[in-house]
């Protein structure tokens, strides 16, 4: 779909700063922000599908369906600043694959899938924990773009919490964690972000603060950083009502 050296741009809130600092130097940009096909929303009893072109502000303002007690809206509320939320998109944030991106860690904890589109062949449904190959590296193939995100619908008794530690409002987090517990579906997941790579996922009984430092042993974080991540998960669990 793209010629060599081209990059897609939607809201420009992730790629724009990289262009400013010459960290990305594509030969041309292909603007996709106006494509209505990327802003579609679908609801079923089993799942919620959100188009990749939806802005953070649309989700924060309740212009899209939500999960639980405004779980997604509260996540979007705390992304950067209003100017960024007005233009930044769900799909762009995920494709950028910043380890400290809010959507990446939270939607991983919720068991989300990235749905892709390809000009040749069928698209894929990629579990979010398999979507990121490393810091600022995703697993999209040539000619493949993020089309939407699919989130399993939680049961009425499901619980959720999210916490991130920032020195000041609006900046990227230094430690972040999300916790999701759905006993009716037999699902308990935690995701740790801002850990120098893909979100670290803890499942079942391992989704507890005591498991964080061991899980981050190879992350490159120092002892203080690993401890901050354990505290972030502890606070996310507290938001959800405890274990």
Tell me the role of every PLM-derived stretch:
Residues 1-243:
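C-terminal structural segment of proteins
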């Amino acid at each position: 779909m793209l010629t060599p050296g081209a990059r897609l741009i939607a809201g420009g809130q992730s790629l724009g700063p990289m262009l400013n600092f010459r960290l990305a130097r594509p030969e041309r940009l292909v603007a996709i922000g106006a494509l209505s096909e990327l802003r579609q929303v679908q609801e079923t009893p089993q799942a919620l599908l959100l188009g990749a072109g939806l802005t953070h502000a649309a989700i924060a303002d309740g212009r899209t369906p939500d999960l639980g007690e405004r779980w997604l809206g509260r996540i979007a509320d705390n992304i950067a600043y209003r100017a960024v939320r007005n233009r930044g998109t769900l799909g762009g944030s995920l494709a950028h694959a910043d380890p400290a991106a809010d959507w990446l860690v939270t939607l991983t904890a919720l068991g989300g899938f990235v749905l892709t589109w390809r000009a040749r062949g069928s698209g894929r449904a990629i579990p979010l924990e398999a979507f990121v190959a490393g810091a600022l590296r995703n697993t999209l193939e040539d000619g493949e773009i993020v089309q939407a995100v699919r989130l399993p619908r939680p049961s009425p008794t499901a619980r959720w919490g999210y916490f991130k530690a920032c020195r000041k409002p609006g900046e990227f987090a230094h430690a972040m964690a999300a916790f999701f517990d759905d006993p009716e579906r037999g699902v308990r997941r935690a995701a740790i972000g801002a850990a120098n790579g893909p979100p670290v996922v803890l499942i079942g009984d391992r989704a507890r603060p005591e498991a964080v430092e061991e899980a981050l042993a190879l992350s490159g974080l120092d002892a203080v950083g690993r401890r901050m991540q354990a505290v972030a998960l502890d606070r996310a669990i507290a938001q959800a009502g405890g274990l």
